[in-house]
Curated annotation (Swiss-Prot):
Belongs to the amidase family. The active site is at K165, S240, S264. It comes from the Eukaryota. InterPro entries: Amidase_CS, Amidase_dom, AS_sf, Endocannabinoid_amidase. GO terms for molecular function: amidase activity; fatty acid amide hydrolase activity; monoacylglycerol lipase activity. It is an enzyme of class 3 (hydrolase). Keywords: Hydrolase, Lipid degradation, Lipid metabolism, Serine esterase. Converts monoacylglycerides to free fatty acids and glycerol. Hydrolyzes the endocannabinoid 2-arachidonoylglycerol (2-AG), and thereby regulates the degradation of endocannabinoid-related monoacylglycerides. Also hydrolyzes arachidonoyl ethanolamide (anandamide, or AEA), but with low efficiency. Plays a role in the regulation of longevity and resistance to oxidative stress. Inhibited by the benzodioxole 4-[bis(1,3-benzodioxol-5-yl)-hydroxymethyl]-1-piperidinecarboxylic acid (4-nitrophenyl) ester (JZL184). This is Monoglyceride lipase faah-4. Disruption phenotype: Extended lifespan, increased food consumption and increased resistance to oxidative stress induced by paraquat. Increased levels of mono- and polyunsaturated monoacylglycerides, including endocannabinoid 2-arachidonoylglycerol. Lifespan is further extended following treatment with the benzodioxole 4-[bis(1,3-benzodioxol-5-yl)-hydroxymethyl]-1-piperidinecarboxylic acid (4-nitrophenyl) ester (JZL184). Pfam families: Amidase. Its EC number is 3.1.1.23, 3.5.1.99.
Length: 647
């Protein structure tokens, strides 16, 4: 009888009968989410009110006009104009020069902090990179100066203001990672990395923005908003350490600290023109942070610094890695100190590739590697082209990509779905979050893997199909993937040894900085960075010559999309990138950070045309060609000058 009843319905009635229950279910779920978000809305509003009040307070306390006659400002600065001139002098110094000026009493900690706060608040008003200021910063600087006056002693980082990625625990501060449910739950401890740097005399003065839940390379969330790239305000600085990179690139901190689970330090460094190094996980272990994926698979979680030069990286890493004082705070970290290489004239064997076998890179990023390799070869170093397909017959590149994405979500997204439950989804991450939440459902994942994704592989994108079908069906599959990962690591090292190379140079990412809407659509980009977390090897990023117009022109004829939807999106994301930072990635074997830094220095010395942003003081020396310049770049040029670096 039921079948006869169904047969009397028209096709449109049948379709409607299937759609309306799904619609009602969607509306119920939407109502539940909005109700839960409403429960946290009060906390969000209270926080945002406090945040703006503290920004105003810091702006007032650091304004040159308010510091006239302040006895803590270094002598010789009696007027607001003199103080502003001194601030600009301070802000033009690199980290090593600023350290020297502080150690030799040219400046004191309080004056330097005021200079950086003054600049950081202005920068933040344009690019929204700071989530919160650290209330104790001025008291900390005053205490440093007072202690020096009494004892004559200074720590190695005396008075250097630094920024902190907001997933690092700091006592009495929330760690929300952009999730409203985590507001008003201040931490009771400070992470050992921040504590060690503070013990050495550095001054943490602000926390910086991250993606909602950390797991993206667009630094945006409903609590703190979207962070803009200081080179182009219409593009992301990357993520998840995007707020850190944006602030440092804009000159708002002496240095910054961040974490890296699948490229979270390296992608922002590449997008913002900075230097960073992701160490082997245990070489610099850091506890008391939100790692993004507690209980993750075989992925090395690393911590490191953002600087403007390799020399600054060497200084900061040399200060903390293997130091007994740091081991007291974090005993799990390796006791092996960073050694200095003496044999600087020794010629090296450098491996390289431009295609990882999974996802091609756009012409600008390919050229960055090819020019760097050619320059090193001209200086007498031997270069050897590598092919990732030759690493393992058992695991070709697409199988390695599947391995990586299973390691990212060993529980098929269950933890991430719980993390996002009841949250308002960020506008730039909606697609990513919805796909993650869908994937943890067994039935949906089964349909995706055996129904939708085989079709997608043929009709849309084999890369999308690979990502969508990366699923651990049960505990046995999860265990097998971890065994495969361990096996691939060994095969990687054997392949490396067979080529007798000292280091590897490869693309830093698949594109330069992308518009905000693309990271959620281009998870395929994470392979070129996440691979080295899965292998748990040192990987650094060094800026090279910026993107040029020829690179952009070649997107049409020099970058094949293969009819692949994701590659088409990738090409779109790379349009209009002329003048933006470009970079290469340097990789070595596990625990060989010293060699990685050495090759990074060689790359830095061979790079030409690298630029640095500098906050504009006074009118622009040259008019901006508004008609032929992207709007986001125009906004950047109104506030920042581009200064050529000389090595």
């Amino acid at each position: 009888m039921g079948n006869n009843f169904w047969s009397t319905w028209s096709p449109s009635q049948r379709i409607f009968s299937l759609i309306w229950p799904a619609t009602i279910l969607y509306l119920i779920m939407k109502l539940l989410i909005e109700k839960m978000w409403g429960k946290n809305r009060g906390a969000v509003e209270r926080f945002q009110t406090r945040r703006e009040a503290l920004f105003d307070d810091f702006k007032s306390r650091s304004a040159p006009a308010s510091l006239v006659n302040n006895p803590r400002i270094v002598k010789g600065n009696e007027t607001a104009e003199q103080i502003e001139t001194t601030f600009n002098e301070i802000l033009k110094l690199d980290l090593i020069a600023l350290k020297s000026a502080l150690q030799t009493d040219k400046y004191n900690a309080y004056t330097v902090l005021c200079a950086f706060v003054w600049r950081a608040i202005d920068v933040n008003s344009e690019i929204n990179c700071i989530t919160e200021v650290i209330r104790e910063a001025f008291n900390t600087a005053e205490a440093l100066d007072d202690n020096y006056a009494q004892t004559g002693e200074k720590g190695q980082l005396f008075g250097l203001p630094f920024s902190v990625k907001s997933n690092f625990y700091m006592e009495n501060y929330d760690v929300t990672v952009g999730l409203a449910k985590l507001l008003e739950q201040p931490k009771t401890t400070t992470c050992p990395m921040v504590q060690f740097l503070s013990d050495q005399g550095a001054v943490p003065f602000c926390l910086t923005n991250v993606p909602q839940g950390l797991l993206s390379y667009v630094s945006s969330n409903p609590i703190y908003g979207t962070t803009k790239n200081p080179w182009d305000f219409s593009r992301t600085p990357g993520g998840s350490s995007g707020g850190e990179a944006a602030l440092l690139a804009a000159g708002g901190a002496a240095f910054g600290i961040g974490s890296d689970l699948a490229g979270s330090l390296r992608i922002p460094a590449a997008f913002c023109g900075l230097v960073t190094l992701k160490p082997t996980q245990d070489r610099l272990c850091v506890t008391d942070t939100h790692g993004g994926l507690p209980g993750r698979g075989r992925l090395g979680l690393s911590f490191g610094f953002y600087t403007r030069s390799v020399k600054e990286q060497e200084f900061l890493l040399g200060l903390i890695v293997g130091r007994s004082e740091y081991l007291e705070l974090c005993p799990m970290s390796s006791p092996a100190k960073l050694e200095k290489h003496i044999e600087k004239d020794q010629k090296l064997v450098i491996g390289w590739f431009v295609d990882d076998g999974f996802n091609p890179v756009v012409p600008s990023n390919r050229r960055a590697v090819e020019e760097t390799v050619k320059s090193l070869q001209a200086k007498g170093h031997q270069v050897v082209e590598l092919k990732l397909a030759d690493v393992s017959e058992e695991f070709p590149p697409f199988a390695v990509a599947d391995m990586l994405f299973r390691n990212v979500m060993p529980d098929n997204g269950a933890y991430m779905s719980e993390m996002y439950a009841g949250e308002q989804y960020d506008e730039h991450m909606k697609l990513f979050i919805r796909l993650v939440c869908l994937k943890q459902n067994f039935l949906v994942s089964f349909l995706l893997r055996y129904g939708v994704m085989p079709f997608a592989k043929l009709a849309l994108s084999k890369r999308l199909a690979c990502i969508g079908s990366a699923y651990n069906s049960d505990l046995a599959a999860c265990r097998q993937n971890q065994e495969n990962t361990d096996s691939y690591k060994l095969q990687w090292i054997r392949y490396w040894k067979s080529k007798k190379i000292d280091a590897l140079i490869c693309p830093s990412f698949i594109t330069p900085a992308q518009p905000f809407e693309y990271p959620a659509q281009l998870s395929n980009g994470a392979f070129i960075t996440g691979l080295f977390n899965m292998l748990d090897v040192p990987a650094g990023v060094v800026p090279v010559s910026p993107v040029n117009q020829k690179d952009v022109d070649q997107l049409i004829d020099g970058f094949s999309t293969e009819g692949d939807l994701l590659l088409k999106k990738q090409r779109e994301a790379a349009r209009g990138t002329t003048g933006l930072p470009n970079a290469v990635q340097v990789v070595t074997l596990p625990n060989c950070e010293e060699m990685c830094l050495r090759v990074m220095r060689l790359v830095e010395e061979s790079a030409e045309g690298v630029q640095r942003l500098q906050w504009r003081v006074g009118a622009s020396a040259a008019p901006i060609d508004v008609e032929n310049t992207p709007a986001g770049v125009v906004s950047s040029l109104e506030h920042f000058e581009r200064v050529n670096l000389l090595h």
